[in-house]
Amino acid sequence: MPDLLLLGLIGALTLLLLLTLLAFAGYSGLLTGVTVSAGSPPIRNITVAYKFHVGSYGDTGHLFTESCSISPKLRSIAVYYDNPHTVPPEKCRCAVGSILSEGEESPSPELIHLYQKFGFKIFSFPAPSHVVIATFPYTTPISIWLAARRVHPALDTYIKERKLCAHPRLEIYHQDKIHFMCPLARQGDFYVPEVKETERKCRELAEATDTQTDGTGADTSDASSVSLDVRPGSRETSATTLSPGAGNRGWDDGDNRSEHSYSESGASGSSFEELDLEGEGPLGEPRLNPEAKLLGPPRELSTPERGEE
C-alpha cells in the first residue's frame, strides 16, 4: 500500500510539472499565432544609440544587456542586415542599442553623452510610410527563442510570396511585446554608416579579385562570391531584467537562392506602391491586401527577344 501511494504521488508530481512547463511555454508565446501584415509602422522617426556588431546574431546578448543597463526604461532595438541562413555567422551584420527619442522629441544632451561615454554611436531612423510588421509576446527569455523560430520564417514567407522589397529587419522590444518591422520604403535610411563601410571594403576586394582573375586567367579567390551588395542608397535623416539578444537565433529560410543580405533577397521585388491597399487597419492605418499582385498585364516579348527564345 505505501508503494502504491508513493507511485501515485510521483505520478501526480510529474503531471503537475508537465502542466507547469506547458503553461510556462504557453505564457511565453508557444501557442500564440503569428500574423504578418503590411501597413503603417509601429513607431515614428526615432533617434537611437547603437553599437555595430559583425558576427553571429546569437552573440549579441551582451550588447542588449549593456544598452539596457545604461538606461533600463528605454526601449531596446536591433537592426539585422544579413540573412543568417545564407551568410556565414562571422559575416552577419547588425546594430543593437536603445531608442533615445521618438517623433518630434529630441534626446537630451546628457543622455546622448552618457551613451557615447560607453562607446555607443547616435543615429536617426525615419518613419517609412509602409512596412511589413508582426508582433510576438515578450514575457520570458523563452519568448525570444520562440520568436526567432516562428516570426522570421513567417516574415520570409510573406515577403517572398508577394515579391516585396522589404529590408532590413528591425526588432523593437517594448513592454510585453516584440515588434518586428521591415521597411517597404526609404530602406537606405536604415543602414548605419558601418554597413556602408563594410560594403565598400567588400566591393574593393571583389574588384581586386576580378582584376587578379583577368590578369591570370584563373580565379584564385572566391571572395567575390560572398560580397554583400547592400546598396543602402542616400540618407535623408541623420543625427550627431531580460536580455533580448540572449536567445540563439535560428531564422529559417527555405529559399535556396544565392541571396546574402536582406536587401538582395528583395532587390527584384515590388514596393508597396505596386500593391493594392486592402483598406484601413484597426488604428486607421492603411493595410495592404494579402492577395495583392503586381499591377499591369504581362509584357509582350519584342521580336529580338522572341528570336532569342
Swiss-Prot record:
Compositionally biased tracts (Basic and acidic residues): 250-262
Residues the record lists as Phosphoserine modifications: S238, S243
Molecular function terms, GO-annotated: signaling receptor activity
Protein keywords: Autophagy, Chromosome, Cytoplasm, Cytoplasmic vesicle, DNA damage, DNA repair, Endoplasmic reticulum, Membrane, Nucleus, Phosphoprotein, Transmembrane, Transmembrane helix
Membrane-spanning intervals of the chain: 4-24
Entry's localization field: Endoplasmic reticulum membrane; Cytoplasmic vesicle, Autophagosome; Cytoplasm, Cytosol; Nucleus
Known function: Major reticulophagy (also called ER-phagy) receptor that acts independently of other candidate reticulophagy receptors to remodel subdomains of the endoplasmic reticulum into autophagosomes upon nutrient stress, which then fuse with lysosomes for endoplasmic reticulum turnover. The ATG8-containing isolation membrane (IM) cradles a tubular segment of TEX264-positive ER near a three-way junction, allowing the formation of a synapse of 2 juxtaposed membranes with trans interaction between the TEX264 and ATG8 proteins.
Protein name as annotated: Testis-expressed protein 264 homolog
Species the sequence originates in: Mus musculus (Mouse)
